[in-house]
Amino acid sequence: MMRRYRRKNSSIPIIVEGRNDLASLRKLSFYGEIIVFNRGISITSFSDEISNKYREVIILTDFDNKGSFLKDRFYGYLTGMGVYVDLYLWNFIRKHVPIRTVEELPAEFEREVEKEIQM
């Protein structure tokens, strides 16, 4: 799953909430464009900027209430502006990975790798 999205990120940007989320994805070898939302502008203004620049985005906000709220708002605004929003990775992580934030992904990924090595 991660390998697939690393490749996808080479041509499609990922939207995250903050700089620490960006750093976490870099630790997981996501080297494509990652756009940080938390820049002091409204969701509608941010969505406008995104829709003027991209036809498709991947949303990877946190998995807590605030992150879910932002995901839903981005999805509503961006799809209404004609942008295809990929939520598959967000939904997959939410369902299968016991974390609440994007920042926790690298540590969880390391734990999974260690489990497989020990088997």
From Swiss-Prot:
UniProt xrefs under Pfam families: Toprim (PF01751)
Cofactor descriptive note: Binds two Mg(2+) per subunit.
Family: Belongs to the UPF0292 family.
GO molecular function, one term: metal ion binding
The Toprim domain, residue ranges: 11-93
Record protein name field: UPF0292 protein TV1259
Source species: Thermoplasma volcanium (strain ATCC 51530 / DSM 4299 / JCM 9571 / NBRC 15438 / GSS1)
Record bears the keyword Metal-binding: yes
Keyword terms: Magnesium, Metal-binding
